[in-house]
């Protein structure tokens, strides 16, 4: 049998975060070759991660990075809040955020190359150490030159679970910050009415038409009634149409008009939703 030193076991543990026995057994299987042992443990980690892939991931955090011409927002999920607030998971989220900072989609983010192979491989290997399913669930890239980033903790003992990136033009940074906070709490899906997909609007119109018709409303006024009822949809889902959370007497559109700001785009993630 190959003589395995505790120094090699310790080195392997430090590199991969695995247990003493797993490290020792991998070194034995590799004939004492540390790099071969690393590959053995990585392969085992990837296989064990595959077994966990179907398990629900409703906890986790959001993390962001900001640059001169773009900002990125990512949601890294796990199974329990115990893991979500662990140092190892937090370190993983920071590493992933650094690695994917130039990606333009979730697919390209997962394919970014790193020492572990790819970001997807890195996450799978860390999932094996953490003992939970871990997933990079969402990723967004927001283009622009001025950004307001807001990260919100839903509980003081947890990492940020709501994240917003707002790209804007103008110089009222304080109001931009307030609007980013508004987005975090009001959860709009679209910037303007024109951004709502026509298919969604048409389905909503058809539904409201049938509801109004069922209520006995005259056929000739149904279009006006439906358009009036669509205002509620806009208030719920369109940023520019929403009432400002700091002053519900004005809409976000009016706030922007008064301050000379223009929202270019935004991204918002809430863990598990």
UniProtKB/Swiss-Prot annotation:
Region feature Involved in Mg(2+) ion dislocation from EF-Tu, mapped onto this chain: 80-83
- Record localization: Cytoplasm
Its GO CC terms are: cytoplasm
Q: Has the keyword Manganese been applied to this entry?
A: no
Q: Which SUPFAM superfamilies match?
A: Elongation factor Ts (EF-Ts), dimerisation domain, UBA-like
Query: What Gene Ontology molecular function terms does this protein carry?
Result: translation elongation factor activity
InterPro entries attached to this UniProt entry: EF-Ts_dimer_sf, Transl_elong_EFTs/EF1B, Transl_elong_EFTs/EF1B_dimer, Transl_elong_Ts_CS, UBA-like_sf
Q: What's the main place this protein lives?
A: cytoplasm
Q: Which UniProt keywords apply?
A: Cytoplasm, Elongation factor, Protein biosynthesis
Q: Membrane-spanning regions, if any?
A: none
Point out the signal peptide segment.
none
Matches recorded under Pfam families:
EF_TS (PF00889)
Family affiliation: Belongs to the EF-Ts family.
Describe the task this protein carries out.
Answer: Associates with the EF-Tu.GDP complex and induces the exchange of GDP to GTP. It remains bound to the aminoacyl-tRNA.EF-Tu.GTP complex up to the GTP hydrolysis stage on the ribosome.
> What's the name of the protein?
Elongation factor Ts
List the lineage, top down.
Answer: Bacteria, Bacillati, Actinomycetota, Actinomycetes, Micrococcales
